[in-house]
Each structure stands twice: as structure tokens, then as C-alpha cells.
């Protein structure tokens, strides 16, 4: 089999032919190729196709890096298709796979056996290609490497989102450092003025006040209208007058103010960085930003490495991106896998509650996957004036998807959706943002909490206690049924009837007398009904008491269930099925289903054995009877 060697150089393609067909199987290639004469004895130049210009060299090299066969290389390989049983040594395995797909009877070889051969070709390339000087070769290689690096930097989409990855990482670091420094300022200056930290919650306002005022004694003379409102300023100055803090030296104050200045500088730079990140996200991934927001989108891109890598991920991967630890732990322990990762912090998922969070995460990840592919892979057309589409037009898909998801979430939750920018807690309730400053009223003295002498009256009970007492009274009135005697009731009714009759007689009209008689009859019926109801209630109460007394004579169901180690409902079920067994002392114990089955099988076996024995006894008795009858007949 004839062996050809393909050498890709900065000057062009060189096709070399090996003089020995078994050149790759030889073990002395390194020793033979140490000199130019040895290399020329092993192979010779078959064909050389030179690049026309630097632009052509760049195009060909860029295609080779991606593992593609260019038309120029395909024409070169067609020159050896007439050879019988051709094998071609290639340095790059990707290029070898691409050559194998061509409709040519060429068998590419791209393994470790060709490394020594290509090392020798690179060392002695000018001797193998006539007319190629070593100085020209180095110049062409340097120019090609520079142009190739420039081409990669210009056209690589991964280089743009590097700014986002670095910005979000720096933003997280700034938040940590800012919180640490702000807490250190409060703790440090708190020795001198501890009440200020309780009034001012905002770290920037606190640092500005410390930087402007300095010592606590200067608060009365300093104007803080630029930093604080008038009400808060008055409270701060009043607290400074009666502060319980210790005195500090000027050197201590200088160090505290230097740290406060750092806090203010960090906070201003953080705001600038956050606005820069929002602008970069809107420009690079407008649809993703419209769906999940700037911070969540930037964290997703940073976690995936680049926008292109994230766009290649399916929706299921985007949904749990950032929850890899929980995912692999769940797979290892065979538990439920997590429903969301970094995407959980999106506002749409935050507004969902309960089981709807998982559904919303799935919907949002699916829409985000589509939006990411549009952001990463779409080439936006340019109009006649050379203007690209606006940011709103680029983010149209993301805005439509968000509107659709908001409608779906509103239908699932049955409530209106909160506007963007509202902080949402995990339970779906908007979180109250911390105020910059608070005025806490001092707790007043409660004289009712003191002890009292015997002559004094008790303090009035609180409204909560009064409500409880009223409820207890109502319950007692409902529970207690006052039952009057039948005779007294009848006497009261007769007295009422006599009074009504007297009144009707005084009126002196028969119509009034008839009306009073009808009223009497109605009242009598009502009294009878009330008596019957009271008697029914009495009988029911007596029945309940008797049942309780009967049940109280022995252990209760709850006690028996506790002894058996079962719940009450389960104990009652097993008792009905006959699965509860009592020992000699009356303690219950339950039998499992397996034990019941075994007992039933043993009972069946015992019954069968008893039947067999009974049958045998019958046969014996019959045989004995037959023998007796035979003896009698003989006699």
C-alpha cells in the first residue's frame, strides 16, 4: 500500500511520498531523520500547492483548525486518487475523519505512529521543498500566527460575554466586602456613639454621617440636612446629647473615618458596576434579561462559561443549573431531584407559591432556552441606512414570553401579578425593603405590673383577657341547661293565662277574648314541645353517662391501643378483623398478616388430618362390623 504524507505549512500544502511502504512500522525513524540526507532518503516531494496570499493562508488555516477540508486541499488529494491502495498520514485526527468522508479511495492515518515523522518534516522542511528558504518560512509563520490570532479575537462570540462573567463575579465580591467593612465601621464607631446604629440602618448614610461629623460632641453644631431628613436629624442630635458611649482619641477617629470613606467609595463603584452590568446584559442577551432579569441571567451565563455554551443547553439543564450538588446527592440516594437552581431567584418563580414554583420553573426554563438561542445565534439584519434593530425589537420575543408566563401564573395563582422590581419572598409575599432609618419609641413604664397592697384594687384586666372571659361565660351558658320543675312551669303559665284573661276582660270585647284564647293554645303547644325537647336531652345525657361508666369499668380503647403499640383507628380495625390477641393478663398484641396466613394454613392442615383420622376410624369400625356379621352367619 503506497504511503503519502500531508504536510500543512504556512506557505502551502505539501504532499510527500514515502519511498518505503512500511515507513510507519520502522523503529529507527528517529535515528534516520536526524540529518537532512536521511529525511530525503525516506521521502520525496510529490506535489506542493502554494498559497496565493496571506488572506488565502488565513482562510485555509482557519478551516484546518476546525477540521474542515477546503476545496484547495480536495483538489490536491484528487491528484493521488488514481493510485491503487493509497494511505495518507495526517497530523490532525479531526482532519483525518473529514478526509475519510470524501468520495476518494484514501485511507487516512492519524495516530501516534506519525508523531516522529512529522517532527522530522518540521525540522527539515526547507530541504524537502525546493525553493523555500528558512528565513521566508519563519516570516510567513509569524505573519500567519498574528492574523489567525486577530481573526479569533474578532469573530469569537465567547469573548463578548467575558465582560459579563467578570462583572457579576466582581459584584458578588463587592457585596461581601462592602457588608464586612460597613459592619466594622458600625462596631468601631459604636463604642463612641452606640445609639446611631439603631437610628440609621443604611450603611452609606451611616458612613457619611461619621465622615462629616466626627466626634459625638460636634453633632449639635453640624448641619446634616444633605444626608438626613429633618426629623431624623433632630433624633440623632438628641441621642448624641445623652449618649452612653465612651470617649475616643483623634487617632482612633481618623482610622474610623478612613474606613467610612472606603465604604462610601465601594458603594458608589458598586452602583456604577450594577448599571454597567445591566447595560451589557441588555445588549448581549436582551431576551434572557427580559425573562429572568440582569442578575439571574448574568449568573446563568457565568455558571455555563459563555452565552453560546448556555444556549446549547436544553431547558431541563437551565432549570437546575447551579443545583449540581443537590442533583447528584439526590441521584446517589435515589431521592427526588431538585426542581430549580439559579433560576429560582427570578421574580416570576418568586411570585408562585407551593407546587406552582416547580411548574413555573419548568415553563420559564423552556422560554429562556428559546430566548438564549435567539440571543446567541441570530444575525440581526441591517437596513438600508446601516442601522441595526433597536434593543426593544431584539427583546420582543422575551417580552412576549414574559407576558405569556405572567398570564399563566395569574391563572394558576388566581391573583394579580406584582410589577417588576418588587422583592418577592419564597412564600410569594412581597418583602418590605429595609428603611434607611428608624425612630424607635422608648418603652413606657407599666404601673399595672407592680405588686399591690391589700387595701388597693386589682388593675384592670387587659382587653385580651376580657375577651377570653366573655368566651368562657358564653360556653358555660351554652353547656348549662337549667331545667325547671314541671309544676312551676305550669303554674307560671296558668298565672300568665289568668293575667291575659283579666286584661281581655277589662277590654270588654268578645273578639279580644277569642284572640287571647288562640294565643293561649299556641303557648301551650310551645311549652309542650319545649318539655319534650328537655326530656330527650335528659335521656341522651343519661345514655352517655351510662356508656362512659361502662367503658370506665375496664381499660379504655386508647390505653389498649397504646399497650399494643398501635394508633386507635388501626387498633379498632385490627380488632374487627380478629387480628388482636389477648394474653392471660388481658394485654393485647396484634398478629401480622403473615402470621395469620400461617395460622390459617396450619388450621386447614389440622382439619384435613382430623378428617383423615375420622375416615380411618370409620373404615375400621365398618371392617369390625363385617367380621362380626360373618362370624354370626357361620355360627
Swiss-Prot record:
Biased composition range(s): Basic and acidic residues: 517-545, 604-628
Primary location class: nucleus
Localisation: Nucleus, Nucleolus
Key words of the record: Nucleus, Ribonucleoprotein, Ribosome biogenesis, rRNA processing
Biased composition (Acidic residues): 486-499
An annotated GO BP: rRNA processing
UniProt-recorded Gene Ontology molecular function terms: snoRNA binding
Family: Belongs to the NOP5/NOP56 family.
Official protein name in the record: Nucleolar protein 58
